Amino acid sequence: DCPVGLRQGCILSPVLFLFFINEIAASVDENGIHGIQLLPGLVELFILLFADDIVLLSDTARGLQNQLNLLNDVCKNLFLNINKDKTKVMVFRKGGFLARNEKWTLNGVDLEVVNEYTYLGFVFTTRMSLKRGVDALAVKGRRACVDCIRHISKLSDISCFFKIFDTQVQPVLLYSSEMW
């Protein structure tokens, strides 16, 4: 039993979480935290937010640690807990190993460095190869297609099959297609 907070499923929960997420994003922005340059001098990306997922982006080890420290401080001030077991670090590089001093912590706890990470259903790898992610999506698409074909014999009209395909299979096949 949790003595504070809202019950799971409470209609206020998403609204309050939006306030918290906006506070976190504003704090990162206001504190001069740097991210990665998408367009030099024009676009800098330092945080990705979706639902209750937060991705911090930095082009240096120190920059990422600064972001983690700030996130931890803001969450403490908002009485939010970060699940350290779900918090991972991924370093994108062409090759080689991490230096011994390339470690990241959150509130004194070492964070796991991973070689691949699934974000919003797409698998990213440290070498930024899209192959692993595309292969995983192809498997999902194949499964959806097989499920659709399995039910075709039960349909009296082929147009129903195409409608089912367009709504159940095509979205799976096209998911993240902008990336590949």
Annotate each predicted stretch with a short phrase.
Residues 81-115:
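Short, conserved micro-motifs composed of acidic
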Residues 12, 45, 111-112, 118, ...:
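Short, isolated positions in well-ordered beta-strands
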Residues 32-49:
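Active-site nucleotide-donor binding segment shared across nucleotidyl transfer reactions
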Residues 3-34:
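Conserved pre-motif C helix in the palm subdomain of viral-like polymerases
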Residues 5-6, 47-77, 92-96, 126-131:
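Catalytic palm subdomain of template-directed nucleic-acid polymerases
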Residues 12-20, 47, 64-67, 137, ...:
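Hydrophobic (often cysteine-bearing) scaffold residues that line and stabilize catalytic clefts
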Residues 17, 21-29, 72, 76, ...:
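Amphipathic alpha-helical interaction motifs in eukaryotic regulatory proteins
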Residues 51-52, 83-88, 92-94, 118-180:
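Non-catalytic, peripheral interaction segments enriched in hydrophobic/basic residues
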